[in-house]
Amino acid sequence: MEGTEKGRHSQSGQPNDMKRRENDMKEHGMENPMDLGAFSISLTVKDLAASQAFYDKLGFTTMGGDAAQGWLILKNGDHIIGLFQGMFEKNMLTFNPGWDQNAQPTAEFTDVRELQRRLKAQGVTFMTEADESTTGPGSFVVVDPDGNPVLVDQHR
């Protein structure tokens, strides 16, 4: 749809919620909203091959991973699912700073340690933390109020 991505407008031509939020934050002297990077859902699976076959039927194709190590990344359009056998206890929302939805590096991104500092300043409790004395790859996990883990995993 024309103007949807670039201008972030709804079908009615009005700015969407994200644009309104950006404007509200700017008016109050706050930084831009957090750019968490590419979004996917990471699913714990009992049988990687059976899960892959199921999601193939929904139009997903394998774009990465290593079945021998128990994980695959599947894609359908802009939608990404990670299948993980024996790696996680629960399904997780996953964000990858520095990547776009095609797992390609973005020109600019907010480092995972900066995201962590911002969330700590807002009182968010962490399940795991990125080592703030390092650079490059790092990750942290927070848990939402309903117990859903959210992984922020930077690969570069």
Annotate each language-model stretch with its function.
Residues A68, G86, E132, D153-H155:
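Residue-level structural signal for beta-strand termini and adjacent loop
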